[in-house]
Amino acid sequence: MHRPLTRLIPAPQQDVKLAGLYLAQHLHNRGNSRHPFVYSNFITSLDGRIALAGEHRQSHEVPPTITNARDWRLYQELAGQADILITSGRYFRQSIIGEAQDKLPVSSQPDYEDIRQWRQEQGLAVQPDIAIMSASLDIPLESLAPYHKRKIYVFTGEQADPERVHLLEHNGATVMQAGAGHQVEGKRMIELLATEGYRSIYAIAGPWVFHTLLEARVVNRLYLTMACQLLGGSEYDTLLEGPLLSPARGMQAVGLYHDPFMPSGGQLLGIFEPVALTPTDPGRS
């Protein structure tokens, strides 16, 4: 972690330390009671793969050749600034069969002790709380047990199965309806989290959840690590899954860093913020 990154944006170009790079942005102070700060993070190959089918697996996995300790450090730093994490029911189904990438952050490993200490110094809870988006409410109850010290919310639609709702609530979760039918509406979910007092919200789920948040125009920042590798493969996930966004969501680079050390080929660390819509944007309603 001691080898530096090269900052490309903003100018001027210069070497910067990796450890502490994202913590220094103090994301937990950027939101307020009306507008929480919502951010997300992905690592992708150059050909857009964030997950691939794996042999002897029921679910896709982050490509092992692009995962690396330096990106993982920054992932933990982003989690370290969150009041609450947004994830999905899919994560907990993966977890119970041993296919989840890892436990939900912040990691308890010694390498991240400084992040946990930083949270304490900033007056944040020991760990961020958890918000689960789920239309089906198919969430294995035993998968929630490792997080019993955190507050757990489950967001679903108005037509959710009442028996599943009762079962989750009986096991300590707070179930909130945030949309008509079975699906969750991103804007309503963020509004409900704001009323619960959350100011910094970190979305760590997959392409469907990210699409839901983008569609609702609630994403304030995207952290995107681009591993300089080409992977191919016919079964894969990319950043977004869902209907065509109209208008397209323009994202401007507010930060860009080059890391030549990991993985093979190096990686680019991008920070993107949404471009404000103008009256002439195609597809604007």
Where are these predicted regions, by residue range?
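Enzymes that bind and transform nitrogen-containing heteroaromatic metabolites
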Residues: 1-285
